[in-house]
Amino acid sequence: DERLGLALHPFDLATNKVLAMAGRLEVRDWVDLLQTDASLQTLGLLVWAACGKDPGYNPTSLFAAIRRHHYSQEEVNMLDFEVDPPCAAELGVRWHDALQEAAAFFSLLPAERAGTCVLTESGALFNGSAQELATELEQNRIVFHKGHIRGAWPQIR
């Protein structure tokens, strides 16, 4: 597309960040994942889907690889923010909350669907709690979308 060029869907970017965080120690990956956990889809479901991009991981092993990271205020300050850098201690609290919530998702989801994107029946990214996911699964209102290597052109709506 001449106006937009090639673009990844935000979900693809987020799952790529999960995989990046498993393999390197970059504070920007941590900050980005905290933001996507809050704005796109919960960390547990991003981990669930991301393991489908790398057959060397399952949700539990990928989760273990990312949960070990922690960062200092000095490292956060080195990033370029439009405003003052966030407080690393507050980010750490958010990270531990996201990790605790993420772990609850893995026991609910069917193992044979690991590596898929968890969607609502209308095709939107599921964004509820683990308890809400349990209810949606019981009522067969969850769709598992297996990604593919191909991509899609961006659309302006």
Question: Model-predicted segments: where are they?
Answer:
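Compositionally biased terminal segments of proteins
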Residues: 1-157
